[in-house]
Amino acid sequence: MNKYIVEFIGAFFLVLTIGFTVIEPGAGAMAPLAIGSALMVMVYAGGHISGAHYNPAVTLAVWMRGRCASVDVPGYMIAQVVGAVIAAFIVLLVKGNPTVQAGTPNVVPALIAEFLYTFALCYVVLNVATSKNTSGNSFYGWQLDLQYS
């Protein structure tokens, strides 16, 4: 299977799972487990084909480490964004106009949290999926699941 299609599928199902579990309240503690589990199975399904980045930040980190060819980076990122956007539209189509209880926007703390957790995700990926010390380790999927959950 084409590595760009794998990135599209992985990002699609990750965002689809997020959309179906957290858009409206009620999933509780199951939402992070569902999201992490969806990521885990997609990593196991596509890791051997594309590296299973499923996130442009992860692709950038893996490229900076020298484990992703420069020629693949734009294709990976386009596939990930297109997959995520299509999944978001499907969530909107299925759920209609969901009622999201949003508080007062607080941009700076949100950006700080996003940066820190994206850093943590990239850090885990670089240390469990791209390190020479863990070559042959096929258990990185559940480690990403735990970090993502």
Over which residues does each language-model region extend?
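Membrane-interface helix-loop junctions and terminal tails of multi-pass membrane proteins
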Residues: 1-149
